[in-house]
């Protein structure tokens, strides 16, 4: 199925690209989320008319993500207290939601889907650098310090 992308999508293309994707991916993800439209003659004309508006929206999203990245870079280490044993091993773990909530409490809005933990949840006390992806082009690093609750 050929679609016209209305947003930049990682590993697929940029705004305005006509790409061939599997029908299920288009029907179940791209079209309902408003990230693409079916590539037919009428939609191509409508897209060309809206292209400037969509590019401006994309630029505004990128600028907002860059501002959030600067705020995150300015943050001191975010401290998360969790129950832990004598050797620093946590009873449980610190995951995406915990990190997102702690950063939001520190003053920078962060969704749990933006936190990247490629090795899984954090299970020990200590200092960690966690990557957050605010936009397809914007990444930032949050310093997280996990301490044992008294």
Swiss-Prot record:
Swiss-Prot/TrEMBL keywords: Ribonucleoprotein, Ribosomal protein, RNA-binding, rRNA-binding
Cellular-component GO terms for this entry: cytosolic large ribosomal subunit
MF-aspect GO terms: rRNA binding; structural constituent of ribosome
GO BP, one annotated term: translation
InterPro entries: Ribosomal_bL9 (IPR000244), Ribosomal_bL9/RNase_H1_N (IPR009027), Ribosomal_bL9_bac/chp (IPR020594), Ribosomal_bL9_C (IPR020069), Ribosomal_bL9_C_sf (IPR036791), Ribosomal_bL9_N (IPR020070), Ribosomal_bL9_N_sf (IPR036935)
HAMAP family, sorted: Ribosomal_bL9 (MF_00503)
Biological role stated in the UniProt entry: Binds to the 23S rRNA.
Similarity remark: Belongs to the bacterial ribosomal protein bL9 family.
Protein name: Large ribosomal subunit protein bL9
